[in-house]
Amino acid sequence: MIIENISIQLQDSSGNWRTFSVAANHPQRITAEMQSLQKRFPDKRVRAVDSSNRIVDML
């Protein structure tokens, strides 16, 4: 069984998405990573994408 990693990304002021961390594809872990990043950068958009850049979740 292959567990896909999920990239947690933040949208910078130029509109580009930057990867800040990588989490295992586990819903609670993805949510925790996203919320942690959102707390550090409350005015920025945060998303989780898979290896094909498909959006898994977004804050």
Stretch-by-stretch model annotation:
Residues 5-18:
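Short beta-strand segments and strand-loop junctions that repeat across beta-rich extracellular domains
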Residues 2, 14, 38-40:
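A generic structural signal for short, solvent-exposed coil/turn residues
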Residues 38-59:
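Short, mixed-charge low-complexity intrinsically disordered segments
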